Amino acid sequence: MKNIKTNSKYLKKHDLFLPTSRVIEKEYLKDALKKKASAIISDNSINLKADTYPKLDIPIIKVPDRYKTLYQIYNDYYNDPFKNCFLIGVTGTDGKTSTALMIKNLLNNFIKTSYLGTNGFAIDKLKKTTKNTTPSIDEILRYGALTKEKDGKALAMEVSSEGLLNKRCEGLSFDVAIFTNIKSDHLNVHKTWKNYLECKKLLFVKRKKNGYSILNKDDQHFKEFKKVNKRNIITYGKKNATYTFSKVRIVDNRTIFNLKHRGKSYLVNSPYLGLFNVYNLVAAIATVHLYVPSLPLIINACASLPVIEGRMQFLDFKQPFKIVLDYAHTVQATKVVMDLARKIAKNKIIVVVGCAGGRYKEKRKEIGKIVSYQADIAIFTMDDPRFEDLNSIFKQMTCEAKNNVILISSRKKAIHKALEMAGKDDLVLVLGKGCDSYMAYQDKLIPYSDYEVIKNYCKRFKQ
C-alpha cells in the first residue's frame, strides 16, 4: 500500500481506496479496479455483492464504520494533532466565517491560533486554499498537524451542516462548540427543515463532556441547541444572557457597543460594522474568555482586529465612492447587508449580485426583491452558474423585482458597469462571492476574483 485515497479520481496503483461520499457510485469502484488499488475499505453502507461487481477481484476490508476508520488511520498518522491543541467549532446559517476568524484573530493575541473554513487555512503568514468550508477528516487532521508544527495551541474552524451530513468531522471531539443562528437555507441539500436542524445540532453531540457550548440566546431555536449538551452552557444576546450587549451604534465606520458580563460593563470598539457583527464578535469574546481570564485585555484587543476578507470589506483604491465586498448569499445575510447599507450610505446604492446555479432556487426571488427594493440600481449577474442556464436564474431573480434592474451575464462586466456608474459618495456593494478565487462553470472551477476585478478597474483612480 502506498497511500490512502478517499476520491477515486486521485487513485494510483497500490493505493488503498476508502470512499467517503454518502452515495458510492458504481463508477468509483470501477475506477478502483481499473487503477489497481491495493484494497477497498467498506462498511455495510456499500453494496459490494459479487453479482453487482463480478470483476471486483481486489481485497475488500470490511469495517463497522468507514468514516471512523478513516479518522483512526489519519489521527494515528498525524500523531493525534488535537491532543494538546484546542479545537473550536462554529456552526450556523450565517456568521460562521466571521466568527471563526474573529476567534482566530482575537485569541492569537494570547495563544497562537489557526483558522480553517471558507477562507481556507491560515496560521501566522501561511495561507492555503480549501475546496470546502469543512474539508474531509484527513484534511482537518492534516491542518491540525500543521497547526502543531507551527507551535499553534488552538484551531478555530467552521463546521457546516453539509460537512456534518457527509461525516467529515467523524471522530473529532470539540473543546468549544458555537452556534450563531439558523435560518431556512440549504434545504436543497437537507430536503427538510428538521433534517437541517438535526444536522446543525450534531456539532454539540461532538463536544467534549468537559467542553463548552456557546449559544446565541436571541435565536428562536436556542432551546433546541441547549438540549443537546446541557452542561457548561454559555449564552450571548441582548438580555438575560452570560454576555449581553446594548447601545449599538456606528461611528466613523466602526461599531461601538456596551458589553455586560457578571454585573460589569465594558465599552467595545469594533472594526466590524453592523448588529450581526456584534453578535459574531460577542461570541468570539466569550470563546476567548475561556482561555484568557482578563476580559478587559480581550476587549482592548478588539479595537485593533484586522479586516475580514470578503465580509463587509471596505476597499480603498483612492476612488471617490465606497466599495464593499461581501459574501452574503443567503436571504437573511442579503437583507442584513442591505439594511446596513441604507444606514451608512450617503448617496446612491449600486449593488452587483447573482444567485448560484443548481441550488437554492427558492431563494432567488427573495434575494432579487430585497436587493432591488433597497438599492437605487441593482445589477444582476452570474454567480457560480454551474450547468444552469443564466436566463432561467435571471427570470427567477427578477419576477418580483422593481424596474431598477440591469442584467449583465459577465460578472466582470457587471462590476465594471457598477463602478462606471458610481459617483461621489455613492456606495457600491458587490455581493455573493466574497474572497472566492474561482467561478464554478459547468464542471470546472475557473480562476476568478471579485477583488482582482475591482482592483484592476480602480487603477485609473491612482493616476
Question: What spans do the regions from the language model cover?
Answer:
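Short glycine-/acidic-enriched loop or helix-start segments at secondary-structure transitions
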Residues: 27-30, 49-52, 72, 99-100, ...
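Acidic, Mg2+-coordinating active-site environments of NTP-dependent enzymes
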Residues: 14, 33, 46-49, 85, ...
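Structural beta-sheet core signal
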Residues: 115, 157, 177, 215, ...
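Short internal beta-strands
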Residues: 38-44, 213-217, 352-353, 377-384
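ATP-dependent carboxylate-amine ligase
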Residues: 10-16, 21-25, 230, 286-310, ...
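Short secondary-structure boundary segments
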Residues: 43-45, 159, 181, 217, ...
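Phosphate-binding loop of NTP-binding sites
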Residues: 69-217, 221-231, 345, 462
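N-terminal leader/targeting and accessory segments in enzymes
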Residues: 1-72, 76, 220, 244-249, ...
